[in-house]
Amino acid sequence: CLLIESDRGLILVDTGFGTREVAMPGRRIAPFFRALNNPQLRPEETAIAQIQRLGFKPADVRHIVISHLDFDHAGGIEDFPHATIHITAREKEVADERRGGAFVGTRRYRPQQWDEAENWSLYPMGGGEPWMGFDAVRDLQGLSPEILLVPLAGHTWGHSGVAIDTGRGWLFYAADAYFYRGEIGAERYDCPPGLRGYQRMMEVDRTARLANQQRIRDLALQQQGEVRIFCAHDAREFELLSGIEKSSTGAPSVRELEFA
């Protein structure tokens, strides 16, 4: 998860598992993924608990930007009932209908994780002024202009990254567009076989996923020092990026929260 402190309140990017996954994992996570991933569901690692430890209240989270609605990214949505949820319309549509692959579609998407949420802002898959050569959605409703949605279809039909202008350069959260730093940050592609297989199992469009991964790789090489890229599931990237300090320019302050 990513927590952004802005003049418009706290903005949470993805939510990880929430308190209800901790309390009722059998109802909230498909047995297949509980067995495969063996998630360690600890109350203290939920986004709401980490935010409270930072001295904030849950109601301080005014907005949630969701990359996609997979079970491990959307579980905490209902811990923040007053927040507005920002997501592509395509992702909301396919998640509600549980269309995310012949085998995993009904398992990856758990509508009970968001069916109580009332405040949604839905966006097209791009169409705004490009960002670094990528389609982008700018002017997210109620959010600072420094925060953009960047569509990255392939892992899911409506999957997006999130770009944040910190005032000292860009952060680019690529979510599940890749899983391991060696996929984008090395001269030669490198990814552990297990993660490679997991990505293939979860993808809905291999051509789009690999094309977007290559574009992220190109961005990493071309914009070194200007854009810091990270994904949702690489622990080493988390270690390097956690605890980014507030910019002296007044741009949004960004912190990483560890996924439960």
Give residue spans per PLM region.
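Catalytic core of the metallo-beta-lactamase
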Residues: 1-25, 56-59, 79-82, 122-185
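Pre-active-site segment of Zn-dependent metallo-hydrolases
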Residues: 9-63
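Short, conserved loop/helix-junction motifs that constitute active-site signature segments
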Residues: 78-81, 113-115
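Cap/insert and terminal regions of metallo-dependent hydrolase folds
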Residues: 19, 34-49, 168-260
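Metallo-beta-lactamase
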Residues: 37-56, 60-72, 89-151, 196, ...
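Active-site flanking residues adjacent to catalytic metal/cofactor-binding acidic residues
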Residues: 13, 67, 87-88, 173-176, ...
